Curated annotation (Swiss-Prot):
SUPFAM superfamilies associated with the record: Acyl-CoA N-acyltransferases (Nat) (SSF55729)
Enzyme class: transferase
Function: Functions in the N-end rule pathway of protein degradation where it conjugates Leu, Phe and, less efficiently, Met from aminoacyl-tRNAs to the N-termini of proteins containing an N-terminal arginine or lysine.
UniProt source species: Synechocystis sp. (strain ATCC 27184 / PCC 6803 / Kazusa)
Keyword tRNA-binding appears in the UniProt entry: no
Protein's cellular compartments: Cytoplasm
GO biological process: protein catabolic process
Gene name of the record: aat
GO CC terms, sorted: cytoplasm
Catalytic reaction(s) noted: N-terminal L-lysyl-[protein] + L-leucyl-tRNA(Leu) = N-terminal L-leucyl-L-lysyl-[protein] + tRNA(Leu) + H(+); N-terminal L-arginyl-[protein] + L-leucyl-tRNA(Leu) = N-terminal L-leucyl-L-arginyl-[protein] + tRNA(Leu) + H(+); L-phenylalanyl-tRNA(Phe) + an N-terminal L-alpha-aminoacyl-[protein] = an N-terminal L-phenylalanyl-L-alpha-aminoacyl-[protein] + tRNA(Phe)
Keywords on record: Acyltransferase, Cytoplasm, Transferase
Enzyme Commission numbers on file: 2.3.2.6
Name by which UniProt lists this protein: Leucyl/phenylalanyl-tRNA--protein transferase
One GO molecular-function entry: leucyl-tRNA--protein transferase activity
Amino acid sequence: MKIDVDYAIAQYAQGLFLMADDRHGLGWYSSDRHALIPLDDQFRYPKSLQRVLNQNRFQVKINQAFTAVCEGCAARPETWISQELIEVYHTFHVAGWAHSFETWHGDRLAGGILGIAIRGAFIGESMFYTIPEASKVAMVKLVQHLRQRSYQLFDAQLQNPHLKRFGAYEVEEKAYKKQLEKALNYRCHFTSEPDLYD
């Protein structure tokens, strides 16, 4: 799929997101409710995870294995991430929008989170792991990273029991768009590279 990156990022900035399905290829979707990961003191995680964090079992890297993270996120029996969508994410990545936040165990990619960063908003697209606890560690470290860089919004899109363990909560579309609009007023850089959305 050939995609206009500027148009696509503008769609994300309006609260839409891309998904693949078997019948129609890629399409733009919206949701009545969005799951948000809190970036304040409402963020939490299981006590058992603190032991893993204290052990420093995993190392964190950013954008070192972007394609592998996309493929890891897509490697499940039911997935909305097609090969076509992976190629689109790669286009976003080359343009500076899409990022992979990774956990490594030695020289092995253990897990990661795929997302799109637009100014003060981080839109989490998917996550995966190959070693237990790796994606949970990635979540904790990503929240720390977003806080350090003054991000205002972490959109995890769809609520699930796993996200609830981190304090994820749902907001309706109208409230979400207000928070998104506010976040887009902040100039945040996910990496040391300047944000392109001006």
